[in-house]
Amino acid sequence: MIRKSLLFLLLGLTLTAGLDQAVKYWVMQNMPLGTEIPLIPFLSLYHVRNSGIAFSFFSSFSHWGIIAITIIVIIFLLWLWKNTEDNKFLMRFGLVLIIGGAIGNLIDRIRFHHVTDYILFYIDDIFYFAIFNLADSFITLGVIVILIEELRTWMKAKRDSNHTSSH
């Protein structure tokens, strides 16, 4: 019988990577490269290709170098997930978001030699944030969830330590 935690991992990875790929497919099929679709005053869909990693970092690395780095990171994160206690739900949830996002972008790199990005935040002609995709959002959200969980754990340990030392 498959453990609940493994089922959670597989379902989470399938949902995150699958949703990312579905949106990218829609963008590639319906928006020519360089096309912008304004959604609301500060948010547009804008179809671009990114040969680097986050915010075009490592764009000078070879295609296979970026794929190798991504696979190594995914393996390490899976190891972390496996070695995280079952009761640390937020930690595991954050790891699933990060791994799923990494897999979504890895699929693009293997298939197309680039990642499709399409989310653009901006303020008129004053400020433009880096264009990114849903996989990047999952990765960022996963990091935030893990940081919140770690902060929560640290604060609880500090409270418990203060409580026991005052007696």
UniProtKB/Swiss-Prot annotation:
Its EC number is 3.4.23.36. It catalyses: Release of signal peptides from bacterial membrane prolipoproteins. Hydrolyzes -Xaa-Yaa-Zaa-|-(S,diacylglyceryl)Cys-, in which Xaa is hydrophobic (preferably Leu), and Yaa (Ala or Ser) and Zaa (Gly or Ala) have small, neutral side chains. Pathway: Protein modification; lipoprotein biosynthesis (signal peptide cleavage). It is a multi-pass membrane protein. The keyword ATP-binding does not apply. It is found in: Cell inner membrane. One of its GO terms (biological process) is proteolysis. One of its GO terms (molecular function) is aspartic-type endopeptidase activity. GO terms for cellular component: plasma membrane. It comes from the Bacteria. Keywords: Aspartyl protease, Cell inner membrane, Cell membrane, Hydrolase, Membrane, Protease, Transmembrane, Transmembrane helix. The active site is at D117, D136. Its main location: membrane. The chain crosses the membrane at residues 7-27, 61-81, 87-107, 126-146. Belongs to the peptidase A8 family. This protein specifically catalyzes the removal of signal peptides from prolipoproteins. This is Lipoprotein signal peptidase. It comes from Bartonella tribocorum (strain CIP 105476 / IBS 506).
